[in-house]
């Protein structure tokens, strides 16, 4: 029985964080490096404002991605996986919309047709990895299948399944969510390289690459499959 939800929620989050650190000791180090990159962007764009409708639209999308990036990291450590997948789905749509804007402007087309429409994750607007994730995340967001409810299921003593209102660490699901989070981060970084090159005079990616290279080297030691390609 739950008597004080707030206290038990904090306790469950702490248990999750301890379990992640035990199984993957350098996860916090990886998240810290990702946060360092985000802070680098925040400081770099602190006094920048768009010079037109298109730039302002892009900057708003980028800021939205940054804010959710930091929140997702916290949810993953807490094993709050439904919340993670909903936010990660939103992040994929942001990357797709940024790609759509670039295609429209490069072809000298109006952005008017994009307004009021859900970003298209097809048509090469996101990587295949993100496109595949999006389908799964949409099933969770729309509650169109029952399988995703396993993210908050728990086995009870009488061999039945219940659903917990408290987050619980699962070595498969929590780490899969972390891998998706890192994949999304890399796709965002790739976009930001080209965006900053076009937006910031005399931009150099040296500081960016130092953080990313450190992340990759640390990641290769982490046993996380998302780093297997490096």
Where are these regions (language model features)?
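Short, contiguous, well-structured surface segments enriched in hydrophobic/aromatic residues
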Residues: 32-72
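Residue-level recognition of alpha-helical structural elements
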Residues: 54, 58, 77-80, 126
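Long, charged low-complexity segments
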Residues: 1-49, 110-230
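Arginine residue identity/basic-tract feature
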Residues: 11-13, 44, 58, 67, ...
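Long, amphipathic alpha-helical coiled-coil/dimerization segments that form elongated scaffolds
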Residues: 98-114
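Short, hydrophobic, well-ordered secondary-structure elements
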Residues: 61-103
């Amino acid at each position: 029985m739950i008597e004080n939800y707030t206290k038990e929620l904090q306790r469950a989050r702490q248990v999750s964080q301890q379990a992640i650190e035990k199984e993957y000791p350098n996860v916090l180090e990886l998240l810290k490096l990702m946060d360092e990159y985000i802070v680098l962007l925040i400081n770099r764009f602190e006094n920048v404002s768009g010079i037109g409708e298109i730039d302002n639209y892009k900057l708003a999308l980028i800021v939205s991605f940054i804010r959710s990036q930091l929140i997702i990291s916290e949810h993953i450590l807490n094993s709050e996986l439904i919340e993670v997948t909903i936010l990660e789905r939103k992040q994929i749509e942001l990357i797709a919309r940024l790609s759509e804007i670039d295609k429209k402007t490069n072809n000298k087309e109006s952005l008017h047709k994009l307004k009021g429409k859900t970003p298209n994750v097809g048509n090469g607007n996101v990587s295949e990895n993100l496109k595949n994730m999006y389908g799964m995340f949409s099933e969770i967001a729309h509650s169109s299948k029952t399988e995703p409810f396993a993210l908050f299921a728990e086995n009870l003593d009488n061999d039945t399944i219940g659903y917990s209102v408290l987050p619980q660490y699962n070595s498969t699901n929590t780490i899969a969510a972390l891998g998706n989070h890192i994949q999304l981060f890399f796709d965002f970084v790739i976009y930001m390289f080209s965006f900053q090159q076009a937006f910031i005079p005399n931009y150099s990616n040296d500081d960016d690459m130092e953080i990313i290279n450190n992340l990759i080297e640390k990641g290769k030691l982490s046993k996380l499959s998302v780093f297997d390609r490096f």
